[in-house]
Amino acid sequence: APKVIVVGAGPAGLFCAQRLLEHGVRPVVLERGKRVEERAEDVKRFSETGVLDPSTNIQFGEGGAGAFSDGKLNTQTNSPLNRDVLETFVRFGAPQEVGYLGKPHVGSDNLKKVVANMREYILSQGGEFRFSTALTDLKIQDGKLRSFTAGGQEEGCDALVLAVGHSARDTFE
């Protein structure tokens, strides 16, 4: 099977990893921040002390920037994939009504549980997560990706999906 790297453990990265598993690919998910449970502690510390950890905070870490939002799910597209996304949220612990309400609301407490459940499922199917591991370089040769560097280590890969959030602009620099 090909070695596929997914960069980012927000919604796009988690759904990508799950879809890869459905096609027999065991993804390696790189995330610059921490697991959602650890992020909650960091966010609480920030709100109490004002001390910001630049790599794991309300913007960075498993679950993405929305992990600490109110959990409202809005879309302005009328895609048939919307139902699949909502059913996936329910399968991993969101309230049943998320699957049929016009304006679904997972809730911030439920959202953290859903994210953790998605991670555990991906791990149980042979996926891998590397937290506190930022992508720092890509090696492209003859127009083809040859390797990536993350956590100070260079590794080969067959494909890499950038599923970084809006705050990870430095990844593109």
Language-model region placement:
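Residues forming the flavin
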Residues: 1-173
